[in-house]
Amino acid sequence: DSKGNIWVGTDGGLYIYNPILDSFTEFNLVSDKGTIIRDFVTMIRCDEHSNLWISVENQGLFYYNSSENKLQNYLHDAGLANVHRFWLNGNTCWLALYGDNLYYTKADFESPLQPFKDANGDEIFKDDIINCEIVGPHNYTYIASSNGLTEVNFVTGKSRRILDAFARTLEFKSDDELWVGTEKGLYIYNLTTDKITHLTVPDQDDSYALSDNAIYSIYRDSENGMWVGSYFGGVNYYPYQWTYFEKFYPREEIKF
C-alpha cells in the first residue's frame, strides 16, 4: 500500500505485513454491515486513490478507505457473494462471479449488477470461471478463463475466442507478445501476426525446457525476464535475450 505495507490474503482472513518491523497484524476492522473478513480472500487490489478492494469467498466485495479507516461490504447479502475476480475501469467495477458470469456496475454499487453482453447480445462468460484479465493495446482486454483465452473490446462489445485451453494466468512479455499459462502448457500469442506458439514439457529431460504443463503464474521482472510458476515443476525462468546463442547438449558417448 502507500505506506509500504504488504497485504496478505489467506484462507482465513486478511493480514498486513510491516517490512520495517517484520511483523504481521490481522486486519479485523468491522465493516458497515457488521462483517469481518474471515473467509478465503480471492483477490486484493489497490485503486488510484490508494484505497483497497478485497474480494472474499462467501462474503462478497470489501472496500477499505485507508484515509478514513472505514470498511464497506458489498454483495454480502445479495446472493452474489462468490466474487472470484474483479477489476476497476474508471468509475466502473467489473466482477467475475465463480462459475456464474461477468457483471459490471458503478463503483459506488448504487446501481444493480448487469451481465456483460458482447456486440451480438451474447453473454459469452455465462457459467464460466474467469481467472485473470490483462489490458492490451487498442482498447482490448484479454481474459483467461476455464473456457480459454478471450479478446474483448468493452467499448464496442466486439469479442473473439483465441484459445480453447483452460487458461489461468496472463502476462505481456512485450506490446505484441502475450504469454498464456494453461493446464496444457504455455501458449505465446503474437498480437501482430495472430500466431500462437505452444510450449509443453518435452518427452525427455531437458534442462532448458518447461518443467511442467500446469502453469499457475507468470511474472515479468524489471529486466524483462519472464518467471513461470507451475503446479508440479517449480519455477521456470526465461531471461531477456540480449543476444541469441545456440545451445549444445552433452552426450555421454562423446568424450574429449
Predicted feature descriptions by range:
Residues 1-256:
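Carboxylate-rich, polar loop motifs that coordinate divalent cations or form catalytic acidic clusters
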